[in-house]
From Swiss-Prot:
This is Tyrosine recombinase XerC. It is found in: Cytoplasm. It holds the Pfam family Phage_integrase. SUPFAM superfamilies: DNA breaking-rejoining enzymes. It comes from Rickettsia conorii (strain ATCC VR-613 / Malish 7). One of its GO terms (biological process) is DNA transposition. Disulfide bonds: none annotated. The gene is xerC. GO terms for molecular function: DNA binding; tyrosine-based site-specific recombinase activity.
């Protein structure tokens, strides 16, 4: 249970994240869920209605108990780390907007996350996917939407959230797409004709009228297409054609990066295309490419021990 004044603060915090920090809707929802989990634990821990004073005076024992509870509930290290980041973010917001001074929560370090290498698809699996994605949709414009979106992600390396934010304004430039990605970082990506042509064909038969600033990829009811809806289309494709279990919309972004590396792209250029803040993040793709080369060597090299 929360004091009504706290809910008002949470609402202001969410607006701050979305409008001033330019966080994606997905991140705002995730952060809100993490904060809700923390405050519910605080309510249980104190056995009384949570007030702003409870939040300000939360000690290190309470915070560590909450993190331990998440660990016992089988949250991954990544989820625990994100949850702590969300709560810290809320406390920073309180520092800006209330009389809260530096809080003990900022002394707590996030658990180390296990680094998972990005999983790419083989070029053959990508070709199969692009050739057959149109079979799932039941309506012509939906079928064309699915193909246009999948080709766009693989041809440009966009995150699914970025691809679903493309508007008609993005189509006005014939040579490149200007994308605002994570952390409001801007990057420029060349248009591939096949992607732009498919999008143009899709828009010609889309049964909904859109303004220039509205996202072009729509669901069957005319609302903005959401990532889980598109991934459900990919699940059908994956099951029918026996494609890898890790096939998702995001795996086509990984495939874009890995295949470019395998064909000679340099890391700095790839970093710019992917919108990575750190080169070390991009370097993870070299590890997957090396694994690919090792597999090719093992199966195809004529001289074996």
């Amino acid at each position: 249970m929360l004091d009504t004044s706290i809910q008002a603060l949470i609402n202001k915090w969410q607006k701050y994240l979305a409008l001033q920090r330019n966080y994606s809707n997905h991140t705002v929802i995730s952060y809100n869920n993490d904060l809700k989990h923390f405050l519910e634990f605080m309510n249980y821990y104190n056995s009384e209605l949570v007030t702003i004073n409870h939040i300000k005076t939360a000690d290190i024992r309470l915070i560590r108990s909450w993190l331990a509870k998440r660990n016992c509930d089988n949250f991954t290290a990544s989820s625990i780390s994100r949850g702590l980041s969300a709560v810290k973010n809320f406390y920073r917001f309180l520092e800006k907007t209330t009389q809260l001074n530096s809080h003990i929560i900022f002394s707590i370090k996030s658990p180390k996350k296990t680094k998972l290498l990005p999983k790419a698809l083989s070029e053959d699996d990508v070709v199969i996917s692009l050739e057959h994605i149109e079979e799932y949709g039941n309506v012509k414009w939906v079928e064309l939407r699915n193909k246009a979106l999948l080709v766009l992600i693989y041809a440009s390396g966009l995150r699914i959230s970025e691809a679903l934010s493309i508007t008609k304004l993005h189509l006005q430039n014939l040579e490149f797409i200007r994308i605002i990605g994570k952390g409001s970082k801007e990057r420029i990506i060349p248009w591939l004709p096949i992607a732009k042509n498919l999008i143009t064909q899709y828009l010609e038969i889309l049964p909904y009228k859109l303004g220039d600033n509205e996202p072009i990829f729509r669901g069957k009811q005319g609302k903005k297409l959401q990532p889980p809806v598109f991934n459900r289309e990919l699940i059908k494709l994956k099951h029918f054609y026996g494609l890898p279990q890790h096939l998702t919309a995001h795996s086509f972004r990984h495939s874009f990066a890995s295949h470019l590396l395998e064909h000679g792209a340099d890391l700095r250029s790839l970093q710019e295309l992917l919108g990575h803040k750190s080169l070390s993040t991009t370097q993870n793709y070299t590890k997957t490419s090396i694994k690919h080369l090792e597999a090719v060597y093992t199966t195809a090299y004529p001289i074996k021990k």
